[in-house]
Amino acid sequence: MTSKEDGKAAPGEERRRSPLDHLPPPANSNKPLTPFSIEDILNKPSVRRSYSLCGAAHLLAAADKHAQGGLPLAGRALLSQTSPLCALEELASKTFKGLEVSVLQAAEGRDGMTIFGQRQTPKKRRKSRTAFTNHQIYELEKRFLYQKYLSPADRDQIAQQLGLTNAQVITWFQNRRAKLKRDLEEMKADVESAKKLGPSGQMDIVALAELEQNSEATAGGGGGCGRAKSRPGSPVLPPGAPKAPGAGALQLSPASPLTDQPASSQDCSEDEEDEEIDVDD
């Protein structure tokens, strides 16, 4: 009977001592210690004992979870003895772990925002385009014939008369002056190229001179549309100029931009019917 009881008690004692058997052996006490070395700090009995007790407490907690019977009281007693230090260690580990995760997530979020921010740049909103009616274009062209630059009073009057804003009137006149300048530059380029072709291009030079005179006259308060178009095949000759050999009698057409100013203004208005001009809201 005693041998059987001893045999039954032996496994119980082994189970009781099993968590403590895994503890590390004590440090060598024969080695001389210095108070400020890292090894001495780590080999202090209090520090090693605290870590060993925390390890034993974790082992006992795991054993209590998996084992239905056993020694929950001894494990709880040992865990209660070392609970402040173990709780501090767990709290510190959880705190630093949470900080690392939050820092990584914040960094990833910033990287993602910068990447998507570079790709998904908002498009610049285009300005609205004002489509003028035929009546508005006709009145603006008629006013542009004798007045290239408007005073504030004239601008207000035209805007009120045509149902436009001051900004729309200003923009239209700016674009119209720029278009007149481009037409003159294109005409000059055509004349320069005609000079290189031969004497037949001299007729266009006379037409260009008259066109420039008319544009200067309109800028000073005279008439003229300022964007007359040279018609190929019907050059304009000054009075008394010799006729080109082989050419028939040349006559100025009644709708010529150099002779009939009202007709030219009507042509200008027809050319500008479908033109849209950018105007700020």
Curated annotation (Swiss-Prot):
It comes from the Eukaryota. Residues 1-35, 214-281 are annotated as: Disordered. Residues 268-281 have a biased composition (Acidic residues). It is found in: Nucleus. Residues 125-184 bind DNA. GO terms for cellular component: chromatin; nucleus; transcription regulator complex. Keywords: Developmental protein, Differentiation, DNA-binding, Homeobox, Myogenesis, Neurogenesis, Nucleus, Transcription, Transcription regulation. Interacts with SKOR1 which acts as a transcriptional corepressor. Residues 1-20 have a biased composition (Basic and acidic residues). Residues 253-267 have a biased composition (Polar residues). It holds the Pfam family Homeodomain. GO terms for molecular function: DNA-binding transcription factor activity, RNA polymerase II-specific; sequence-specific double-stranded DNA binding. It comes from Homo sapiens (Human). The keyword Transport does not apply. It is linked to Central hypoventilation syndrome, congenital, 3: A form of congenital central hypoventilation syndrome, a rare disorder characterized by abnormal control of respiration in the absence of neuromuscular, lung or cardiac disease, or an identifiable brainstem lesion. CCHS3 is an autosomal recessive, neonatal form characterized by slow and shallow breathing due to a deficiency in autonomic control of respiration. Affected individuals present with respiratory insufficiency and absence of the hypercapnic reflex that stimulates breathing. The lineage of its organism: Eukaryota, Metazoa, Chordata, Craniata, Vertebrata. Transcription factor required for the development of GABAergic interneurons in the dorsal horn of the spinal cord and migration and further development of hypaxial muscle precursor cells for limb muscles, diaphragm and hypoglossal cord. InterPro entries: HD, Homeobox_CS, Homeodomain-like_sf, HTH_motif, LBX_TF. This is Transcription factor LBX1. One of its GO terms (biological process) is neuron fate determination.
